[in-house]
C-alpha cells in the first residue's frame, strides 16, 4: 500500500529553524512537516501535538508521523538521553553526597539534601520517576562535571543517529540551542527499552527515597502507568516554552508500540493513549512510512580528531573513588593546571615588580 504525505502548516513557535536534509534519517517521507500516514487503514487520531511519531519497537517501523524531524525544546524528555548515557558509566551502588548546586536546581526536584547520601541508583529513580532536576545535576557532577556530561550525551545522540538532538542541560531545562525531535525521542526511548536498568527505572510506579532522616515515597509522573493497559512507561516533560512533550511505550500481545509527541498545548494523556491504540490496531497491516534506524557502530560514532571526545569510561569498583564521595569536591587535572598557572604567574609578576620597581596596587592581577 502506498504512503500518502499530507502537508500541513505547522507553527514553529518554540522550535529551532533547520535545513531539511536531502535524505532525512529514517526515510524520505519523514522529511514532511505534515502528517505522513499509510493508505488502506484509518488515519491516526487527531492530536494537538505539533509533532509526533508512532512506531513499532520490535521492528523499528514508523507507522505514522507528523513533522517527525521538527526540532523543538524537549523539556524533561531529554532526561531519557541523560539516563541512557550515564547508566553504563556509573556504578549504581556508588554513594554520593550532592553539592549545594545540585540541590538548588530550579524547577521540578525530588528534594536532594547536602546532609544526605544517596546511591546512584536512587538518583536514577529520581531522574526518571520524579523528573528531578536536582538528581540530573547530581548525576552529571558524579560523571565528572556538567561539561563532560554534555559531551557524553551529545556523543550518545550521534551514536544513535539522533541528529536533531543537541543537549545543553542534563535536566532538559530550556536553554538556547537545545533541541530534539519526535523522531529522535523515539530513537532514544527504543534504545533505552533495550537496557534492563533503564527499563526498570521508567516502569517503577512508586519507590522509597532516602532523606537525611529516614525516607519518603516518590511516584512516577507518567500517568499512563496507572491508566493504560500494558504501559511500560518512559518520560513526560513540560516547560512554558517547550509546552508538553512525551515519549512512551506499551506492550500488548507480545508487541510493543511507542509514541512520542512534542509541543502539546494541553492535557495530552488521553490523546497519547488514542495514538497507542491506533498503533496496535494497524501494526502488521499498514505499510510503514519510515524506519527507526539502528545506532552507528562505535568507530563511526566516535568524534573526529580535534573534536571534544568523551573521556569518561565505565566506572568499575576497581577504579572508582571511595564508596562515599562528594560530587562537588572534585580535584581534576584542569583545576590543578589552573592552580599551577596562578602560582607561576604570581612568581613572574613578583620578579618583574622587583626588577623594575614599579609600584602596583595589590589585587589587580587576574586569572
Specify the residue positions occupied by each region the protein language model found.
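Domain-terminus/edge residues, biased toward the C-terminal soluble/receptor-binding domains
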Residues: 163, 170, 174-184, 189-367
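Sec-dependent N-terminal signal peptides
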Residues: 1-7, 340-345
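Active-site-adjacent loops and short helices of periplasmic peptidoglycan-processing enzymes
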Residues: 2-183, 187-196
Amino acid at each position: 500500500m502506498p504512503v500518502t504525505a499530507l502537508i500541513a502548516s505547522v507553527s514553529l513557535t518554540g522550535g529551532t529553524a533547520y535545513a531539511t536534509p536531502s535524505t532525512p534519517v529514517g526515510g524520505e517521507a519523514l522529511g514532511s512537516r505534515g502528517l505522513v500516514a499509510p493508505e488502506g487503514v484509518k488515519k491516526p487520531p487527531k492530536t494537538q501535538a505539533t509533532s509526533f511519531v508512532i512506531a513499532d519497537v520490535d521492528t523499528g517501523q514508523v507507522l505514522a508521523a507528523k513533522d517527525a524531524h521538527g526540532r523543538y525544546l524537549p523539556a524533561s524528555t531529554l532526561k531519557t538521553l541523560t539516563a541512557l548515557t550515564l547508566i553504563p558509566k556509573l556504578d549504581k551502588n556508588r554513594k554520593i553526597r550532592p553539592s549545594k548546586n545540585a540541590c538548588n536546581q530550579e524547577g521540578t526536584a525530588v528534594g536532594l539534601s547536602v546532609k544526605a547520601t544517596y546511591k546512584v541508583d536512587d538518583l536514577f529513580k529520581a531522574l526518571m520517576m520524579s523528573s528531578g532536576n536536582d538528581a540530573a545535576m547530581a548525576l552529571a557532577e558524579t560523571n565528572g562535571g556538567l561539561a563532560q556530561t554534555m559531551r557524553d550525551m551529545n556523543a550518545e545522540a550521534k551514536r544513535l543517529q539522533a541528529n536533531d538532538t543537541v543537549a545543553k542541560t542534563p535536566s532538559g531545562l530550556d536553554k538556547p540551542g537545545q533541541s530534539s525531535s519526535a523522531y529522535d525521542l523515539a530513537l532514544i526511548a527504543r534504545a533505552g527499552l533495550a537496557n534492563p536498568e533503564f527499563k526498570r527505572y521508567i516502569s517503577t510506579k512508586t519507590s522509597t527515597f532516602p532523606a537525611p532522616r529516614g525516607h519518603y515515597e516518590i511516584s512516577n509522573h507518567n500517568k499512563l502507568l496507572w491508566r493504560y493497559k500494558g504501559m511500560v512507561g518512559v518520560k513526560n516533560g513540560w516547560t512554558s516554552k517547550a509546552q508538553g512533550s512525551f515519549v512512551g511505550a506499551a506492550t500488548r500481545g507480545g508487541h510493543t508500540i511507542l509514541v512520542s509527541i512534542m509541543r502539546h498545548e494541553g492535557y495530552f494523556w488521553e490523546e497519547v493513549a488514542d495514538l497507542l491504540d491506533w498503533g496496535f490496531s494497524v501494526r502488521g497491516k499498514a505499510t510503514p512510512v519510515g524506519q527507526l534506524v539502528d545506532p552507528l557502530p562505535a568507530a563511526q560514532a566516535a568524534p573526529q580528531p580535534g573534536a571534544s571526545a568523551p573521556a569518561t569510561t565505565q566506572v568499575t569498583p576497581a577504579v572508582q573513588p571511595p564508596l562515599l564521595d562528594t560530587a562537588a569536591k572534585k580535584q581534576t587535572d584542569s583545576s590543578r593546571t589552573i592552580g599551577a598557572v596562578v602560582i607561576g604567574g604570581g612568581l613572574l609578576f613578583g620578579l618583574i615588580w622587583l626588577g623594575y620597581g614599579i609600584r602596583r596596587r595589590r589585587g589587580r592581577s587576574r586569572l
